[in-house]
Amino acid sequence: QLLFDILPYISILDPACGSGAFLVAAMKTLINLYSAIIGKIEFLNDINLKTWLVEIHKKHASINYFIKKSIITDNLFGVDIMEEATEIAKLRLFLALVASATSVDELEPLPNIDFNIMPGNSLIGLLKVDNKTFEESLDLVTQSYYHTYAEKLEERNRLLDTYRHASSYADDLRALRDNIEKKSNEVRGTLDRLLLDEFDKLGIKYEEATWDEKKNKEGKPKKRALRMDDLKRLKPFHWGFEFSEIIGKRGGFNAIVTNPPWEIFKPNGKEFFEEYSELVSKKKMSIKEFEKEQGKLLKDKDILKAWLAYLSEYPHVSEFYRNATQYKNQISIVNGKKAGTDINLYKIFTEQCFNLMSKYGECGIVIPSGIYTDLGTKRLREILFEESLVTGL
């Protein structure tokens, strides 16, 4: 049962996967499980297990390579907002796989994991989408020829399964990948519109930063309705669609392992202006020195334009983190007052992990000790220590 019904369906996620270090570590853990089982098969009187092992040896020159490839294909998933990081993560898994081969004869085609390790914003996107909501978002003309959302998901999952378990580099495989991407983009467009509607229902506006020429400082922001291009820049990742088999049918991921960013979500002037001045990049720079250098840089119209555009990307996202239902535990009430107005990304990631995890799933997350004491993390602490079982600190 463990070999055939459990291990192939274990789903492990890193929602801030970076270069894939935690995914490689997860792979090694599963390898140990497989190795222990295979080591016992020859001592058991189970004809099914022995037949399985004989067939594996017939089809694959290296059983170690086969096991690693199966784990990478069926068990490991990752998302990162930086596309370059996801490419490095895939490469890292490929290198770990190839390292198990002792000769060229043991090598097989690399696993197809373009839809396992994906770029996107893990914190912004739809967790679940029901068929009715999806259909209602389409106009009548589109509805007349458009497959239902459920049909789209079923078709995509079927194609994904074919793609992931294909064993060649043939042109038809590349065509299959392109076809999956094309069909996925059609659905993503509708999901983006639904997400934009969600921002609108929350009363979130785009606050465009301005510059007061007379006072030579930032002016009052101009508020307007959020547009699709504003949303696209956030790189939304719709979990309920991209991993519908896991989120929808299995109820979430079995395990989540991650080391999310520990930083306050707000504009960082020094970080921004480092790109334009060597002085700013110096480690020992006083606040007054920085402000003086910043003032000089902002006299350049192009730099000023870039700075205002940079500032404009924060307010609507902050409002989403504060008001979205999926992040309802970010603000705590202490003595009748709201506590914890600062938005720290590790807090957002912590709650998102709970959203993505299955009912009996487990999560290993690297977070600062402040979660034990900060007033603003009261609700998160209650989730961790009262609604969950903490097995290690």
Give a label for each model feature.
Residues T391-L393:
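Class I S-adenosyl-L-methionine
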Residues Q1-G376, L380, F385, L389:
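SAM-dependent methyltransferase catalytic region
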